[in-house]
């Protein structure tokens, strides 16, 4: 049996889980999320826990078991605590600002790069750090990756947009002397 899939998912107080025919709805203090139901799995809510079991033992079912359990656990954690990613802007003259639902990145181009935030995502800029937060883990990660792609960190000076905990592999510059 899947080591991840067989673990029950605890439901924190203030979070409500409803299992429908084709989606599982999760509501909590931070918002509401839905995740699709897999037809080869059985979902059950018992005494403050969600248990997912397999209906058969095919390879496809075993693969879906751990995946669907993790997706549902992320929904439950998202509506109770939320998720956030922190980006750091490194470089002389590089700036970041949040204006409503638009993030303004000035990262060495001749024009500022404006990125619209999708619904359910908020951003906060403090100095050279940008924190992206929301209830949907996948969407938070996607928006953070989209912003990082604007100016990836380069290996010589480390300039660019990087994740807060990311280590940039640095390269040595040219070492040849004049002739």
Swiss-Prot record:
Residues 152-169 have a biased composition (Basic and acidic residues). Residues 170-179 have a biased composition (Basic residues). One of its GO terms (molecular function) is structural constituent of ribosome. GO terms for biological process: cytoplasmic translation. One of its GO terms (cellular component) is cytosolic large ribosomal subunit. Residues 151-179 are annotated as: Disordered. It holds the Pfam family Ribosomal_L6. Keywords: Ribonucleoprotein, Ribosomal protein, RNA-binding, rRNA-binding. InterPro entries: Ribosomal_uL6-like, Ribosomal_uL6-like_a/b-dom_sf, Ribosomal_uL6_a/b-dom, Ribosomal_uL6_bac-type, Ribosomal_uL6_CS. Belongs to the universal ribosomal protein uL6 family. This protein binds to the 23S rRNA, and is important in its secondary structure. It is located near the subunit interface in the base of the L7/L12 stalk, and near the tRNA binding site of the peptidyltransferase center. Part of the 50S ribosomal subunit. PANTHER family: 60S/50S RIBOSOMAL PROTEIN L6/L9, LARGE RIBOSOMAL SUBUNIT PROTEIN UL6M. This is Large ribosomal subunit protein uL6. It comes from Nitratidesulfovibrio vulgaris (strain ATCC 29579 / DSM 644 / CCUG 34227 / NCIMB 8303 / VKM B-1760 / Hildenborough). The lineage of its organism: Bacteria, Pseudomonadati, Thermodesulfobacteriota, Desulfovibrionia, Desulfovibrionales. The gene is rplF.
């Amino acid at each position: 049996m899947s080591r991840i899939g067989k673990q029950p998912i605890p439901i924190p107080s203030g979070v409500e889980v409803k299992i429908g025919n084709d989606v599982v709805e999760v509501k909590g203090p931070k918002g509401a999320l839905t995740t699709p139901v897999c037809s080869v799995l059985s979902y059950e809510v018992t005494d403050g826990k969600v248990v997912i079991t397999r209906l058969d033992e095919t390879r496809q079912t075993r693969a879906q078991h751990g995946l669907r359990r993790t997706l549902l656990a992320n929904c439950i954690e998202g509506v109770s605590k939320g998720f956030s990613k922190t980006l750091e802007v490194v470089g002389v003259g590089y700036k970041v600002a949040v204006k409503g639902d638009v993030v303004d990145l000035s990262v060495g181009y001749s024009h500022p790069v404006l990125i619209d935030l999708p619904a359910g995502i908020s951003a906060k800029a403090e100095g050279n750090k940008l924190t992206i937060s929301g209830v949907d883990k996948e969407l938070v990660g996607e928006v953070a990756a989209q912003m990082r792609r604007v100016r990836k960190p380069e290996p010589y000076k480390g300039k660019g947009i990087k994740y807060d905990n990311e280590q940039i592999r640095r390269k040595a510059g040219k070492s040849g002397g004049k002739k």
